[in-house]
Design a protein with these regions (language model features):
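RNase H-like DDE/DDD metal-dependent nuclease/strand-transfer catalytic core used by mobile genetic elements
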Residues: 1-14, 20-125, 129, 133-136, ...
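Short, acidic, Ser/Thr-enriched surface-loop or helix-capping motifs
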Residues: 19-20, 224
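C-terminal, beta-rich DNA-binding module of retroviral/retroelements integrases
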Residues: 136-240
Length: 240
C-alpha cells in the first residue's frame, strides 16, 4: 500500500501480507515498488509465516511484470512458480475482492501509521515490526471467534512450511512450470484482458466471471466458467 510520507524523510510503501487462515500478518516498509524489492520481502515473509498454496494479488504492474512484454512473466510470478505457489489475480477494478487485506490496511492506517509520529524511515521500519508482533499476538478477530492469529496457529498445532533462514533469492532466468490464475468479468464486448492483451471469448460468457489459467508448461491459456473448461488459447511465453 502507499505511497505514504514521513515528514522530513520522504515517501515509503508498506508491503502487507495476511494469511486468510489465521489472519497472521507480515508487514515491511519499503522505499520503492520495484519488483526485486517486493520479491525480497516475499522471501522474508515466507521465512517467517510460511509458504502459501495461493497468493492473491491485485493487478499492480510490479506483481505481473511488463506491459511491453506481458508474456514474459515478471520476477514475482516466476518466484511464486519456483516455490510452487499459485498466484491468483483479482478482477480488474474491483479492489474489494481483496477485502481481508484491505480491512487490515485500514487497521494499519488507523491504529499504527496515523497514531504516532515517526522520526525517520528507519524508525518507522522498526515500529512496523513491533506493530506486526503486537497484532499477531493481541488483535482479536470476530471471524476467528474472538481469537488472535497466534491463538489460531497454536490451537491448530499448525506448522507451516517455511524457507530456510539463509535462503537467497534464486536466479530466475526462465519461467518455471506452474499455473497462474486471473479472475475476470466479461462485458458485452466479449473481451478477456490478460495482462493487457485482449482475447475474444464466446458470447455465452457475457456478464460472467471467469477464471483464466495460464499453464506455463504447455504454453496454454485455459478459460473456466465455474469449474468447466469452456475455451483454450495458445499462449506462447517469452523469455524462456
Amino acid at each position: 500500500m502507499g505511497p505514504r510520507y514521513i515528514k522530513g524523510d520522504g515517501r515509503f510503501y508498506s508491503f502487507n501480507v495476511i494469511d486468510v487462515f489465521s489472519h497472521q500478518i507480515y508487514i515491511e516498509a519499503q522505499r520503492t515498488k520495484e519488483d526485486r524489492q517486493i520479491a525480497s520481502s516475499l522471501m522474508r515473509c515466507w521465512k517467517k509465516i510460511g509458504l502459501p498454496d495461493f497468493l492473491q494479488l491485485d493487478n499492480e504492474l510490479s506483481f505481473r511484470g511488463s506491459n511491453r512484454y506481458p508474456r514474459s512473466m515478471g520476477l514475482i510470478l516466476r518466484l511464486c512458480l519456483y516455490y510452487d505457489v499459485h498466484p491468483v489475480f483479482i478482477p480488474i477494478g474491483e479492489p474489494w475482492r481483496n477485502g481481508i487485506i484491505e480491512h487490515f490496511n485500514d487497521t494499519y492506517n488507523k491504529k499504527f501509521f496515523r497514531r504516532q509520529w515517526f522520526q525517520s524511515y528507519s524508525n518507522l521500519k522498526r515500529q512496523s515490526k513491533n506493530f506486526q508482533r503486537f497484532h499477531n499476538a493481541h488483535h482479536h478477530y470476530s471471524c476467528l471467534k474472538g481469537k488472535t492469529p497466534l491463538d489460531v496457529v497454536t490451537e491448530a498445532n499448525f506448522e507451516p512450511i517455511t524457507l530456510g533462514p539463509n535462503t537467497k533469492l534464486p536466479r530466475l532466468e526462465y519461467v518455471p512450470d506452474g499455473e497462474i490464475s486471473l479472475i475476470r468479468f466479461i462485458r458485452s464486448n466479449r473481451v478477456l484482458d490478460i495482462f493487457g492483451e485482449k482475447f475474444e471469448v464466446p458470447r455465452e460468457l457475457i456478464y460472467s466471471y471467469v477464471r483464466a489459467v495460464i499453464v506455463t508448461k504447455i504454453h496454454t491459456l485455459q478459460l473456466y466458467l465455474n469449474n468447466e473448461l469452456v475455451d483454450t488459447f495458445k499462449y506462447q511465453l517469452t523469455g524462456q
